[in-house]
Amino acid sequence: MSQINISIDCVLFGYDSDLDLKVLLIKRKYDPNTAAYKDHNSLPGDLIKYDEELSPAASRILESLTGISDIYLKQFSIFSDPNRVKHPKDQKWLRKFRALPEERVITVGYIALVNIEDFNTDATYFKDEIIGELTREGYYEKIWAKVNDIPELAFDHNNIVEEALKYLKKELNHELSSILLPKNFTLPQLQKLYEDILGKKIDKRNFRKQILKEGSIVKTKHTTNTGKKGKPATFYQFNDTIKETVKD
């Protein structure tokens, strides 16, 4: 009987100053003789160790492949299709570094949230001395892809991203929004984040009326010149109650 492996794949959502919700992907080295995907984009993921529990393994894997740690990280689903790594493209790539590439792999999906501006987005985390033995798998760069423009990914990772976005949509609240947004943000930034997650346009007037009525955000003294005629844009912050909820 073949062995069943357990892996963890992390869907790291980030929001940036371009007002785009994005997903962090790992771009692996391309060997034209053996690689199946030109650029081979995938989610940050790896097999768990024999003596690891899931949550510590998720933190280890995310940090080892992205350099990012101590962030919101939560299990959201399990992907157990017996054929999820059996596609010829995937098998061709797996043979590069696994003795038994045909073995079944059940993956546990974790969702992670960051504000992109808070983290270094260059590829320095992927130098050989940082990755160590993981360089055998060819990791060498990380990229942020817009959620509405995800390229073809390895294995069933496109489906995992879709399920993670559904989970985020279902769980969307101001606590999660406060993680993705900068400390000081404008109402257009907040509205665009909600639109990206919900996948639809929101009426500007109704959105602002509802948000301000809830009292979850407070106006700051900061303003910015948008370069357009009219009043400068006002910055807001989530109130202390929201911030404490996130910490808990």
Give, region by region, the residue ranges found by the protein language model.
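N-terminal strand-loop-strand
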Residues: 1-41
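Active-site segment of metal-dependent pyrophosphate-handling enzymes
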Residues: 4-6, 22, 56-59, 63-125, ...
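Short, cationic low-complexity segments
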Residues: 33, 128-144
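Short histidine-centered catalytic/ligand-binding loop motif
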Residues: 42-51, 179-180
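Long, intrinsically disordered, low-complexity Ser/Thr/Pro-rich regulatory/activation regions
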Residues: 106, 219-248
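Short acidic, hydrophobic short linear motifs in intrinsically disordered regions
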Residues: 181-193
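Short helix-coil junctions and helix-kink-helix linkers
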Residues: 193-201
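Charge-enriched amphipathic alpha-helical scaffolds
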Residues: 201-219
